[in-house]
Each structure stands twice: as structure tokens, then as C-alpha cells.
């Protein structure tokens, strides 16, 4: 039996889809958002918070042998630091402990490239680049790095585990939240773009890689999962063209970004709403960050990434269908 945490998220949902397609029995847990209806007798779902140790023990009694840990909080709002640390560190520690206690055969833990260190601009980041406090610009990155340390602790205590560090995951998820928000912004003809560069990857590729790593003998390794390094301008242009919408034409400068995130922080203090832009997201949007994906290809030589252009065209097609059905 396989356990998937964070089953209602973009990646968790895709992972469950692929596992069920392989006729594998899956137990999925979720916290606030219920899972979509997979309509499969192979799937069992439980409402269980990863901070609930007793609840996790009950779930593990289903005869769990493999764990895919996708559950996490993603936020770049400085006010949510406590929540980030609680869920991404303590929650991961609970999963590791549950796996050790149940004697699972393997854990695949979803980390993030935010848990890696930073280099000078234009130098590609690989898995050996260590996270440092000086190079860190987000509480999220720190929480994911410390979450990885919990997995390494588990490995030290005899757990077989691998960690995946995806870049920005693209797919047809909830376009009011997460990385799928990029599609909504462009659809709404948001006029701004940044010339920052980042890694991007199809959600289907991330799920496929995770399953291949789980079914391999590979353990005690971390892998960057990234198809291509692209500028946000290129990504926005591809999405706009696929939707037949106006391409964003106003460039965000560092000076403008500073003004906007300060205004958003001020507004958030009074409204209690999440800021649209924070100091952390502004820094990320302007940074030119390149990722080296060669380690994964070395370990899984048969694997080929989808092109990001293909991903965007297909994802826009799914969103367009959803919009037409409303």
C-alpha cells in the first residue's frame, strides 16, 4: 500500500492519477481541501493533518510500505513563518518518524530548489550547492531546507529515502493559488513582466520521476527536477499566445518592485489579506537563477522531459475547456 500526503494539491493529484493508472493501491491524506473524485476502488482517502501524530499512526496501520510526502505549506508572506516551520519541518519529522516506526520500504520527499544554496548570477545551481543563511532570501526556503534535514536524519536511522527539488511546477491546478496562478494572471491580461529567469517543469514529469525513483534502488540522494531555464517574460508570452491574450508589455524594474512590495505590506497590515507581492517574491521574480538538471538524467537515463512550450499549450487547453464549461 502506498501513502500520498498532500493528495489534493497540484502534484499530489497528478501523482495519485499516475499511481492509479498503474493499478496501485493508494491511501491519500489531505488537510483542508478534499481530493477530487477519482472514482477508483484502489483509492482510500483520510482527512489527516501531518501535525497529528496519532492520526498518522492510524493511517500507517493500513499496511503502508511506500510514502510520497507532497504535503507542505508554500508561502512567501513573512507573517506565516511560524506556520511554515511547523508544517514543513515538524510535519516532515512526523512523516519520517511514522515511516521508521512502520518499517516502510521507501520515502520520496518533495522538497524544493528553494532549499538549495545560491550562486552568482548565470552560474547553474546543482544539488551540491549547500543552503546558507547568508544566501537565503525566504522563510519558505529555510523551512524546506530544515525539512530535508529531518529526512537525512531518517536516512541516518535506517530509512530508505530520496528527495526531489522541483523548480516551478506548471500544470492545470487551482488557478487562484500556487504556481497555476501564473496562467490566471496572463489570462486576465496583467500587464507586467519581469526579465528574471527560473527553472520550470511539467507536473506530469515531476510525478513520473517520483514514481521511477521510488521503484528504483536509488536512496540517500537529492535531485533537481527541472525541464528548462526560462525567463518569466518568455513564459508569460507563451501563455498569452496560447490563450490569444495580450502579451504583458510593461517591465518591472527593481525600483518599482520595491515600491509595490512595501505598499502591499502596508495594505496587508490593514486588510488582513495576503499581499500580492512580498519582498521575497519580488527578489525571486527579478533574480536570474539557472538550474542544472544533469544529475537526474544520469540516474534515470531513459527519462525525457516535456518541452515547456508543449506543457503550456496543453495546460492552457485544459484551462480553456474548464472556462468553456462554466
Give, region by region, the residue ranges found by the protein language model.
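N-terminal Rossmann NAD(P)H-binding glycine-rich loop of SDR-like oxidoreductase domains
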Residues: 2-22
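NAD(P)H-binding glycine-rich loop region in Rossmannoid oxidoreductase-like domains
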Residues: 44-90, 94, 98
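Conserved catalytic-site region of short-chain dehydrogenase/reductase
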Residues: 76, 113-123, 169-175
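Short-chain dehydrogenase/reductase
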Residues: 85-89, 126-129, 136-148, 168, ...
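Conserved Rossmann-fold NAD(P)-dependent oxidoreductase catalytic core, especially the SDR/UDP-sugar
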Residues: 90-139
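Conserved beta-loop-beta element that borders a ligand/cofactor-binding pocket
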Residues: 111, 148-172
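Substrate-positioning beta->alpha
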Residues: 146, 177-178, 194-214, 220-221
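Mid/C-terminal beta-alpha module of Rossmann-like enzyme folds, strongest
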Residues: 209-276, 298, 307-308, 313-326
Amino acid at each position: 500500500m502506498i501513502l500520498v500526503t498532500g493528495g489534493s494539491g497540484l502534484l499530489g493529484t497528478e501523482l495519485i492519477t499516475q499511481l492509479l493508472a498503474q493499478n496501485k493501491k493508494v491511501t491519500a491524506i489531505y488537510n483542508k481541501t478534499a481530493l477530487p473524485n477519482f472514482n477508483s476502488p484502489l483509492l482510500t482517502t483520510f482527512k489527516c493533518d501531518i501535525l497529528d501524530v496519532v492520526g498518522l499512526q492510524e493511517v500507517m496501520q493500513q499496511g503502508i510500505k511506500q510514502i510520497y510526502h507532497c504535503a507542505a505549506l508554500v508561502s512567501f508572506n513573512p507573517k506565516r513563518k511560524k506556520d511554515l516551520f511547523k508544517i514543513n519541518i515538524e510535519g516532515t519529522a512526523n512523516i519520517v518518524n511514522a515511516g521508521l516506526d512502520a518499517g516502510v520500504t521507501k520515502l520520496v520527499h518533495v522538497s524544493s530548489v528553494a532549499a538549495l544554496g545560491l550562486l552568482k548570477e548565470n552560474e547553474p545551481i546543482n544539488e551540491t550547492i549547500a543552503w546558507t543563511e547568508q544566501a537565503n532570501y525566504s522563510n519558505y526556503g529555510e523551512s524546506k531546507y530544515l525539512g530535508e534535514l529531518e529526512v537525512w536524519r531518517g536516512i541516518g536511522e535506517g530509512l530508505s529515502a530520496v528527495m526531489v527539488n522541483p523548480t516551478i511546477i506548471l500544470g492545470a491546478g487551482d488557478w487562484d493559488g500556487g504556481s497555476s496562478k501564473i496562467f490566471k494572471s496572463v489570462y486576465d491580461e496583467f500587464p507586467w513582466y519581469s526579465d528574471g529567469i527560473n527553472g520550470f517543469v511539467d507536473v506530469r514529469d515531476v510525478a513520473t520521476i517520483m514514481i521511477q525513483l521510488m521503484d528504483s534502488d536509488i536512496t540517500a540522494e537529492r535531485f533537481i527536477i527541472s525541464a528548462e531555464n526560462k525567463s518569466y517574460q518568455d513564459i508569460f508570452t507563451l501563455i498569452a499566445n496560447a490563450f490569444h491574450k495580450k502579451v504583458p508589455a510593461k517591465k518591472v524594474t527593481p525600483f518599482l518592485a520595491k515600491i509595490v512590495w512595501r505598499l502591499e505590506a502596508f495594505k496587508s497590515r490593514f486588510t488582513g489579506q495576503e499581499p500580492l507581492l512580498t519582498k521575497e517574491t519580488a527578489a525571486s521574480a527579478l533574480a536570474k537563477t539557472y538550474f542544472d538538471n544533469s544529475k537526474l538524467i544520469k540516474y534515470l537515463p531513459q527519462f525525457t522531459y516535456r518541452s515547456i512550450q508543449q506543457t503550456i499549450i496543453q495546460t492552457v487547453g485544459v484551462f480553456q475547456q474548464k472556462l468553456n464549461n462554466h
